[in-house]
Amino acid sequence: MDTCGVGYVALGEAGPVGNMTVVDSPGQEVLNQLDVKTSSEMTSAEASVEMSLPTPLPGFEDSPDQRRLPPEQESLSRLEQPDLSSEMSKVSKPRASKPGRKRGGRTRKGPKRPQQPNPPSAPLVPGLLDQSNPLSTPMPKKRGRKSKAELLLLKLSKDLDRPESQSPKRPPEDFETPSGERPRRRAAQVALLYLQELAEELSTALPAPVSCPEGPKVSSPTKPKKIRQPAACPGGEEVDGAPRDEDFFLQVEAEDVEESEGPSESSSEPEPVVPRSTPRGSTSGKQKPHCRGMAPNGLPNHIMAPVWKCLHLTKDFREQKHSYWEFAEWIPLAWKWHLLSELEAAPYLPQEEKSPLFSVQREGLPEDGTLYRINRFSSITAHPERWDVSFFTGGPLWALDWCPVPEGAGASQYVALFSSPDMNETHPLSQLHSGPGLLQLWGLGTLQQESCPGNRAHFVYGIACDNGCIWDLKFCPSGAWELPGTPRKAPLLPRLGLLALACSDGKVLLFSLPHPEALLAQQPPDAVKPAIYKVQCVATLQVGSMQATDPSECGQCLSLAWMPTRPHQHLAAGYYNGMVVFWNLPTNSPLQRIRLSDGSLKLYPFQCFLAHDQAVRTLQWCKANSHFLVSAGSDRKIKFWDLRRPYEPINSIKRFLSTELAWLLPYNGVTVAQDNCYASYGLCGIHYIDAGYLGFKAYFTAPRKGTVWSLSGSDWLGTIAAGDISGELIAAILPDMALNPINVKRPVERRFPIYKADLIPYQDSPEGPDHSSASSGVPNPPKARTYTETVNHHYLLFQDTDLGSFHDLLRREPMLRMQEGEGHSQLCLDRLQLEAIHKVRFSPNLDSYGWLVSGGQSGLVRIHFVRGLASPLGHRMQLESRAHFNAMFQPSSPTRRPGFSPTSHRLLPTP
C-alpha cells in the first residue's frame, strides 16, 4: 500500500483490516489538535486535502475507564502493540495529489522527487525526544526524521508510562486549541504566568495607605479602628488641649468614585494591580487622611486641620524667605519731618469732627442700648469680654495696611490708613487729579491672645500729602522694622517701616516711617496735637523714562504689590490704562535712578507691559515663587503672569468684575471678590480660582448679595475675610486647596459672620432710638442721599458675633441672620450706603495673627480678635519666636554696680 509521505498520516474509515480493527487510540485527542493545527496552516491550493480522525464504529467506543489504564497494563499493552504509525499508514488510503506537491501539507519548490518508502519507525524510546520542550525549536524536514504525528504519539506513549499525578499549576507544554480559536503557543502562556507573578509581587510590595503624620497607622482603609488620641493635624503637630474622647479618630476618607474591585479568586487570569497615576485636574490618587471629631473651639477637626497646617507652612516660609534688615540707605532723617501748625494742617484734615451715632450689640451679652459718638482721631476702650475696639478717622476709608513686625518682637502694632477728606466726595478714575489728603498712622498697642488690650487705639501722627486720593498703600513685607530703642546718631531715627502709596496723580511715593517715640521726642513740649507732618519722601516712582515722562498716558495708579520674598527689591503697580509697571528699588542704573536736588530719588521702571484693556484694579504676587503674579482688571479678566515671559499670560479667566483678590501662601490659586453688576444669578460672592496648573474648577466659598469691596487672607489661619456693601463682615476657612475642592461637603460650616452693620432710623431724638427695629434687624429703608441727611435721622447698629467659641454655630442667631441675608437681598441703592465696608485686613504678624481691622463709608474703624481660631499651637510658636528674638536682638545692658556690698576684711582683736 502506498504511503502518504513524510509527516503526513491519512486515516481512512474505520473498519476491519485482516484480523485487526482500528479504533480510537489513546493519542486521538492529540491527533485532533494536530488536525486543527495542520488544517489552519494549509494554503488555498491545499484546501482539497482533508485530514480527519477515524470515527469509531457503533459499539466500539472506548469508555474513559478503558482509555485510562493502570500503569502496569499500559506498559504491557504498549509492548504488545505494534507501531501505530506504521499500522495507520497501512490502513490509510492515499488521496489524489497535485503534481509537483508533496503530500503532507508542505509546499516544496523544484522538481518532484521520487517517493521513498518510510523508514521503519524506531521503538518508543524516551531518550529520543527533548524532555523539556519538544516544540520549542522547529525541526527541519529531512529524510529519516519522524513526522509530527509520530513525535506526538511518542510523547503520548511516554506520558502513559508516568503514574497519574495531580494537574500541575503551570500550563501544559504543548499547544492548547480552544474551540473556535487559533492554537495558543507556550510563549503566550509563559507571558501570562509572568504577569500573574508580577501582579502578586506588586500587590505585596505596594505601600500602606497614607495616614496623618505622627498619627496611628490605619491597618485597613475600609474598616478603621478607633484609637483614642489627641487631635492631630496634617502638618504633624499635636494640639494641646484637644479633646481626648472616643469620637475622635483617624479614618481614611472614602473616595466619591468607587474604585474597581480586585479580581476574584476564581478568576483564571487576574490582572496585575498597578498603582494608578494621578493626572492634572483630577482628585488625588492617594487616600487622604481625614480627621473626625470636634476641636475645642466647636468646629469639626477636618475644618481646623488646614488651619494648623498653615501655621507650620507660614512659619517655615518666613524663616526662609523673610529678612531682618533691608534698604539700609533709607533711614528716616529728623530734618525731613516738618511739624505743621494748626493753621497749616487744617486743609489736610478730614472735615467731619464727630462720628455718626452708633451702637454695639454683642451676642450673648445683655443689650444696654448705649449710643456712642466719638470725636475725630478718638477711640473707645476695648470691651473687657469681647476685646473689640472702635475709633473714628474722620472720613470714608479707602486704603489700609498693617505694619509688619518680626516674629517674636512683642512690640506695639500699627496700621496705616487713608480717609477721604469729604464724606460726599466722588473720585473719577478717568483723569488725574491732585489735592490735599492725610495719611494716618494708628497705634493699637500690644495685641495678644491671652489678655484684652490695655491701651486704647490712638492716633500717632499724620503725613500731609498733596497727591490727591490714595487708592492703595503697602508696607515692605520684612526687613524694614527695627527696635524702637536702637541707638542712632542724630539726625537718624529708628525706622518703623517702608510704606508705598498709590496716588491719584499717577505717582507712587515711598516713605520711610520712624518710630513714634523717637519722632515725638523731637517736637517741642507745646506742639499741637494731633501731630501732622509734612515729609519729604525717600523716592518718587514714575512711569516712562528720563526723556519721555508723561503720567497722563497711564492715568491713576490704582493698586500696588510688593515683592514678598527677600530682598523685596521689586515693586509692582497697576494703572488705569491697563499697564503693569515694575521698579527695581535698589538699582544703580543711571537710566532708572536720578538724584534730585532735595536729596530724594526719582526711579523709572525696568519693565512694563499692557496687562488689561482697562484699569488694573488689584495685583498680588505669588508668595511661594516671585516669578508669578496675578492681576485683575475692569475688563472682567483675571490673568496669571510669568514675569520671565510677560508677552502672554499663562492663564486668563473672564468671569466677572473683580474688586480685590488674595493669594494665600499654601495654595496654587486666588480667592476673588466680585462686583455683583456682572455676576450670574446665584453665583455672586467669593470664589476660589485655581491658577491653571491643577485644573480644578472654581470653588464657591461664600455667596454674597451685594458688591464685595474688600477681601483679605491670613496665611497663618488659611482664612479669608470679606466686607461688602451691605455692611456685613464674614470670614471663611478655606479647605485644603491642594486637593480638589469639588468633594468639599457643606461649605456653610466653614464660614461665619464677624459683625453686621445696619442703618437704623430713630423717631424723635438721638436719645430715643427705635430699639425694636434695631433688635429685629430689619431696618426701614431710608431715602437720604447725603451724609448730613443720613446721620440726622439714623444711627448705625453693629451686631457682633461671639468669636470666642463656635459651638452650635449653625443654630445661633448671627449665623441664621447671615444665611437669611444670603437668600434674598435687602439692599437699597437709592440712599447713601453708610454701613458699607470698604477695607478689611488680617494682621500678617505672628504676635497678632488672629486680629482683624475693618472700616468703611462711615469712617469708623473696628478691630476684632477671632479668638476661636487661635490655637495652643500658635501660642507655642509665639513663645518660641520671642525666645529666639530676645536671644538675637536683646540690647546689651551697660555694666551696673553690684546690688550687694563688697566683702570687708578686718583684723579681729586677739583674746
From Swiss-Prot:
Its main location: nucleus. Residues 114-123 have a biased composition (Pro residues). One of its GO terms (cellular component) is transcription factor TFIIIC complex. GO terms for molecular function: RNA polymerase III general transcription initiation factor activity. The gene is GTF3C2. This is General transcription factor 3C polypeptide 2. It comes from the Eukaryota. Keywords: Nucleus, Phosphoprotein, Repeat, Transcription, WD repeat. Residues 24-187, 205-297, 765-785, 889-911 are annotated as: Disordered. Residues 92-112 have a biased composition (Basic residues). Required for RNA polymerase III-mediated transcription. Component of TFIIIC that initiates transcription complex assembly on tRNA and is required for transcription of 5S rRNA and other stable nuclear and cytoplasmic RNAs. May play a direct role in stabilizing interactions of TFIIIC2 with TFIIIC1. WD repeats lie at residues 366-426, 427-483, 484-535, 536-603, 604-654, 655-690. The modification Phosphothreonine is found at residue 895. SMART domains: WD40 (SM00320). Residues 253-262 have a biased composition (Acidic residues). Residues 64-81 have a biased composition (Basic and acidic residues). The keyword Transferase does not apply. The keyword Glycoprotein does not apply. Residues 263-277 have a biased composition (Low complexity). It is found in: Nucleus. Part of the TFIIIC subcomplex TFIIIC2, consisting of six subunits, GTF3C1, GTF3C2, GTF3C3, GTF3C4, GTF3C5 and GTF3C6. The modification Phosphoserine is found at residues 63, 132, 165, 167, 220, 260, 597, 871, 892-893, 901. Residues 35-46 have a biased composition (Polar residues). GO terms for biological process: 5S class rRNA transcription by RNA polymerase III; transcription by RNA polymerase III; tRNA transcription by RNA polymerase III. It holds the Pfam family WD40.
